[in-house]
A protein has these predicted regions:
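Conserved hydrophobic core element of enzyme catalytic domains
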Residues: 280-391
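A glycine-rich phosphate-binding loop feature that marks nucleotide/adenosyl-phosphate handling sites
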Residues: 153-154, 185-191, 249-251, 266-273, ...
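An anion-binding catalytic pocket shared by soluble metabolic enzymes
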Residues: 23-39, 157-240, 244, 257-260, ...
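Short Lys/Arg-enriched alpha/beta "domain-start" segment
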Residues: 1-52, 156-161
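Non-catalytic accessory segments adjacent to catalytic cores
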Residues: 49-158, 162-163, 258
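A short glycine-rich, hydrophobically flanked beta-strand micro-motif that places a catalytic Asp/Glu
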Residues: 19, 72-78, 148, 180-183, ...
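Contiguous alpha-helical scaffold segments within structured protein domains
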Residues: 32-34, 39-41, 95-127, 133-134, ...
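A residue-level signal for conserved active-site and pocket-lining positions in enzyme catalytic cores
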Residues: 76, 143, 200, 247, ...
Length: 391
C-alpha cells in the first residue's frame, strides 16, 4: 500500500523516545518497549556458563518466559572493565524494522535542534595526550607490553537539554552502514553511537567477528582516497598492530569452536571518515556457547586495550586521567536461544540532559607518532562531532 504524503512526513519527523533501546545492523534491526528486568551483574568471567553472570542471566530469561515473553532478549551495554556493573535489561517487547527503510527515512529527516556550546574541554589536553603516547610507545618497545590503546575525551556542555532521538536520525543519515545504537541508561542518560566494529555475531551454531585495528584518514579526492587506503594496507606499523589483535583472538576462539576460518591477510573497509584494516572471522561454536559467552571471551580485544591484556590495562590505568566506564565496552543483545550481536562501543557519545561526553582511542606501538595519534583520535571524534554540527 502506498504511503500518503502526510503519513510519510509524520514518519520522517518521528524520533525515538530516550527510554527505548535501538539497534541497527545488517543482521537484525529492532527497537524495544518497556523494561521487564534490569541486570547490572558485572560481566567478569561471563565467558563461562557457570559464572554468576551467566547463571543470573539464565534465571532472568526463565522468569521472563514464565511471564509470557516467548523469546526474551537481553539488551544494553557492558563496560570496558567487565568488573564494573553492566548496563543491561530485558525489555517487555521488541519490534523489528527494515534497516534499508530506516536509512532512507533518516536521509529525509528534517527536524533539527539548535544547540549552543557553553563549554568544551579536551581530556586530556593535546600536550598531555602526546606525552602519554610517547610514554606508551616507549613501553611497547620493551618486553613489558606490545601494544597499548590510549583514549581521550571531549566534554561538552550545551545551553539546553539534548534530544537523543533527533541526534540518532542525524547519526544514521551520516553513518548509514555502521552498527547504530541508542542505549537508555539507568541514570537517565543515553549511550549513542555508530560503531564500525563487530565484536561477535552468533546465529544458531555459527558465529562471526570482524576486528578492526590500523586506520587512515579518508581523502575528499577519489584517487588520493584510494592511495590512502593502499598505503594503510601496506603499512608495516598498522599491519603489526592488526596482527596482534587477530592472533590473540584466534588463540581464544580455537578452544571454543569446532571450526574457525580466518584469512591470512587483512582487508580494507571504510567509514565516512576512515579506512580500517579488517579481518573477518567465521566459525562454528561449541554447543554450550551463547552470544554473550563468546562476546565476554573476546572483550576487551587488543583493539581496545592492547596486548598482553593485563600489562596493557595496567598502563592504561596509569596514563589515562579518567575511567572509561562504558566507552570501549560493548553494546548489543543476546536472546534466550543464544543468538545475538555485540559491537564495540566506539564512535560514540554519552548524553545526559545538557552534557555530552565523546570518546576516541588509538593503538600505540613502537612506531606510533604522538602528533599522529592525536590527529587520528581527532578524526575518530569527528564522527560524533559532525552529528552535533561541531568540528
Amino acid at each position: 500500500m502506498d504511503t500518503s504524503l502526510a503519513e510519510e512526513v509524520q514518519q520522517t519527523m518521528a524520533t525515538l523516545a530516550p527510554n527505548r533501546f535501538f539497534f541497527m545492523s545488517p543482521y537484525r534491526s529492532f527497537t524495544t518497549s518497556g523494561c521487564f528486568a534490569r541486570f547490572d551483574e558485572p560481566a567478569v568471567n561471563g565467558d563461562s556458563p557457570d559464572s554468576p553472570f551467566q547463571q543470573k542471566l539464565a534465571a532472568l530469561f526463565a522468569d521472563a518466559k514464565a511471564q509470557g515473553i516467548k523469546n526474551p532478549v537481553m539488551v544494553g551495554a557492558i563496560p570496558f572493565d567487565p568488573r564494573q556493573p553492566s548496563s543491561l535489561y530485558i525489555p517487555e517487547s521488541w519490534q523489528s524494522f527494515s534497516r534499508q527503510e530506516k536509512q532512507a527515512s533518516a536521509r529525509r529527516f528534517t527536524r533539527s535542534q539548535s544547540l549552543n556550546v557553553v563549554e568544551r574541554q579536551a581530556i586530556p589536553e593535546q600536550t598531555t595526550f602526546e606525552q602519554m603516547v610517547a610514554r606508551a610507545a616507549a613501553l611497547t618497545a620493551t618486553p613489558q607490553v606490545d601494544k597499548v590503546v590510549l583514549s581521550r575525551l571531549i566534554d561538552i556542555t550545551t545551553d539546553a537539554a539534548i534530544d537523543s532521538g533527533v541526534l540518532l536520525e542525524r547519526l544514521i543519515a551520516q553513518n548509514p552502514v555502521s552498527y547504530n545504537f541508542h542505549v537508555p541508561l539507568a541514570d537517565g542518560g543515553v549511550l549513542l553511537g555508530a560503531s564500525p566494529e563487530l565484536l561477535l555475531r552468533k546465529d544458531g551454531e555459527r558465529f562471526s567477528s570482524i576486528p578492526l585495528a590500523g586506520s587512515a584518514r579518508r581523502q575528499p579526492d577519489e584517487v588520493l582516497d584510494r592511495e590512502a587506503g593502499n598505503r594503510l594496507l601496506a603499512s608495516e606499523k598498522d599491519r603489526h598492530e592488526h596482527e596482534l589483535v587477530t592472533q590473540a583472538m584466534k588463540e581464544v576462539l580455537r578452544e571454543r569452536s569446532s571450526e574457525l576460518h580466518v584469512p591470512s591477510s587483512p582487508q580494507l573497509i571504510t567509514t565516512p571518515t576512515l579506512w580500517h584494516l579488517a579481518t573477518p572471522f567465521e566459525g562454528k561454536a561449541n554447543s554450550q556457547e551463547n552470544a554473550l559467552t563468546l562476546a565476554c571471551l573476546l572483550h576487551p580485544t587488543p583493539a581496545l586495550s592492547g596486548f598482553p591484556h593485563q600489562a596493557a590495562t595496567q598502563v592504561i590505568a596509569e596514563l589515562e586521567p579518567f575511567d572509561r566506564e562504558l566507552f570501549g565496552g560493548i553494546v548489543g543483545w543476546c536472546d534466550s536461544e543464544g543468538n545475538g550481536e555485540w559491537v564495540v562501543t566506539i564512535r560514540c557519545a554519552k548524553l545526559r540532559e545538557n552534557q555530552v561526553h565523546l570518546f576516541a582511542g588509538a593503538g600505540i606501538v613502537p612506531a606510533s607518532s604522538p602528533l599522529g595519534e592525536w590527529r587520528e583520535t581527532g578524526v575518530k571524534l569527528s564522527t560524533m562531532l559532525n552529528v552535533f554540527g561541531l568540528h
